[in-house]
């Protein structure tokens, strides 16, 4: 509401006929500023507030950018499948000879994780966080770097999925991915959305200076990126200790589905009460 009112103020200022409205909106924003930016919790309470309130709120405010990341990833995956179907050499080029040979033998390459669970889990966490940060950072190039990262990640997933399905390992692959992928993939999409949000700030500043536009978009984007770090840590633990085990396939899918539902509820519902309280407070101020 605060950001929308600020945008309305910018529009009103650009129209000389809306001078009275501009003054009213400016006064309203001045009173609302303290409610929005003053008195935020700090320390441990601040961290708790961020993850229980602010992060899901920012996700809902910027969900279109995450949706764009999902679409780019899906397009990359579809392209990966299409190119693998039409050109077997492409499949070998992307995955490499050793991995193709392993898949052709109907062997999963993931079982080696079991022997080194703690080390593997740590490496997975580090890699996933690094990939998410790189995907986000690509947004500074007007979103081009983020676009490339999301498309290439999707393409790789598409090629792997096709290769495994071709060799009868589709169920093995998806049952491996399900437990941790339910958190890891949404985290990647949110990081991609953060990158696109950053790119929007660079390319489309509107009436703001490019510096101010990037600053505003960057704050929101960083919040999105920081919010997925714990999700990636949890996903790394699951990928190292649960996904590669011999746990029954239905249980793996159940774990994945349960985690995804919990994540969706968290992102869609958490922080709504405090947001409603702020809106009520702002409305009361504007009427006084």
Task: Report the location of each language-model feature.
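Alpha-helical transmembrane segments and their helix-start/interface "positive-inside/aromatic belt" motifs
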Residues: 56-75
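Short aromatic-rich membrane-water interface segments that cap or initiate transmembrane helices
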Residues: 103-123, 174-183
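Soluble N-terminal domains of membrane-associated systems
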Residues: 1-48
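Individual transmembrane alpha-helix segments
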Residues: 116-145
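Hydrophobic alpha-helical membrane-insertion segments
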Residues: 71-85, 141, 183
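Cytosolic juxtamembrane amphipathic/interface segments immediately preceding
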Residues: 41, 45-62, 111, 115, ...
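Generic detector of multi-pass transmembrane helix bundles and their immediately adjacent loops
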Residues: 137-288
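Interfacial/capping segments of alpha-helical transmembrane domains
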Residues: 81-106
